[in-house]
Amino acid sequence: MADTVLNKAAVFIRVDRFRKLLDSLAPAFLSLGVFLGVATVASLLATVVSTGWHRLSWNLLTEYPSPDPNQAGMRSAFLGSLWTVGLSALICVPLGIAAALYLTEWSENKLLRRFLEFNIANLAGVPSVVFGLVGLSVLTYGLGWGRSIIAGAFTLAVMTLPLVTVSAAEAVKTVPEALKHGAYALGATKLQVTRYIILPRALPMMMTGAILAISRAIGEAAPILVISGLLFIRQDPSSIFDKFTVMPLQIYNWVSRPQAAFRELSSAAILVLLILLLAFNATAIVLRYRYQKRVTL
């Protein structure tokens, strides 16, 4: 009996020492993982900056693509990105917010709500090239829109719609139930509660999620490559039915060239794209802070 107790005590001591060893090593392993991730991103960014910094100029945004790297720019790709991303935002943001409000506040059929939530969550994980193939078959050929800006914008809108919907639904869930119940107790209708209680408090997170989804759309190349198929174009888009290209495709075009000067241009274009993404993220932070401050006051 005494030997059994001693053996259990010895096992307990060894297990306790092993747990303490793991506790002491865990911060080191976690810090190593963070360091490796940051170091990888920093090295890639340093390579891009050192390669393309001297190519940054207004000519990069104002000149058309050219076989001569000293005269080449990405004006058409830059304008094409603005057209497609702007139109997709006008489509997906209102629809995503409306869908989130319906799923969280207006839907009374639990089975339908769960079915929609499940499928929206699954759509958020679908590879972007699949959306491009669907857009090609339905919009480009099925509806006869061709390889136009509106086809690319709708494809990006459908791709980002699940992200906007999920983030907006999570924002609505953060609104305190006591505020909604208090408004209902005072005789407010569901529409009034949505307009004056839910939206003002959920809008900062909604806008943040929407801007982050749009930031993802800016850097997408696969669906636009399927829809547009153009890597070289020397004209400004003037309508939603014009042909187009975007910055990621222009970067891919330059990277695939054998000349070192074109690879330098691709690094400069990557820097422009990163600056746009950082600007969108900063805008999301500023808007969220201002709206939260306004709601608090």
Residue locations for each model-derived region?
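Periplasmic/extracellular loop-to-transmembrane helix junction in inner-membrane transport proteins
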Residues: 9-32, 46-88, 109, 250-264
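Generic hydrophobic transmembrane alpha-helix motif, especially the helices
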Residues: 121-158
